[in-house]
Amino acid sequence: RVRSSAASDVYKRQVYVLPDKAIGKQACPVVYLLHGYGGNARSWVQLKPELPQMADEKGIIFVCPDGKNSWYWDSPENPAYRYETFVTSELVKYTDGNYATIPDRKARAISGLSMGGHGALWSAIRHKDVFGAAGSMSGGVDIRPFPQNWEMNKQLGEFAANKASWDAHTVVNQLDKIVNGDLALIIDCGEADFFLEVNKDLHNRLLARKIDHDFITRPGGHTGTYWNNSIDYHVLFFDKFFKK
């Protein structure tokens, strides 16, 4: 458990998946995995039961926080929901202070699915001093086409009356904060996913800014089967980044 002043609960439950190396106090890199809307801290280990085996094989610590339905923002409408601060500051400091990590952005990555894909890119782009690599699986990287969905209006206010806030809280409008080389990026989305078009738009915006990134589309939808496959690509990408 992590004591948090940024999130409404005094304690936020997290799930830590530790490789044997870390249990033996040998310092390891860390991948933060963010769940989607309706999920919780256990979502990733339920979706990918092989996560402990992957941790051992790669020598990576996986940290799976409970982000509720926050979209990982510091909500301008809900002062109790400061999940950007929680994930990028409090949780990272707690993890580095209590586990055998390599406390450096070059050994720290973040990824997630759906809401968590948005959250991972949002967190990394805005805190490139904290994370060296980031990924998104089926991420809601432009929220504006979906103004009535997934309780986003609880965090940002109703879209019609708060368009400027919605513009400011969408990933595709954060790209001015990075230049090529700031982050190692991997983005993927299924060909049958309702987020496919916003992910293609993000890809094109990154190309226009000449920001290197891996962009993958594969057959599949917005499903656990797709993400169970996606995580393998992301862990491979992050492992290569950590070993540079």
Roles of regions detected by a PLM:
Residues N78-Y99:
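Alpha/beta-hydrolase active-site loop
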Residues A192-K244:
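C-terminal catalytic histidine-bearing segment of alpha/beta-hydrolase fold enzymes
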Residues D9-K21:
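A short loop-to-beta-strand scaffold at the N-terminal edge of the catalytic core in hydrolase folds
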Residues E158-R205:
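The feature captures the conserved acid-bearing segment of alpha/beta-hydrolase catalytic domains
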Residues G97, P103-M152:
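Primarily recognizes the serine-hydrolase "nucleophile elbow" in alpha/beta-hydrolase
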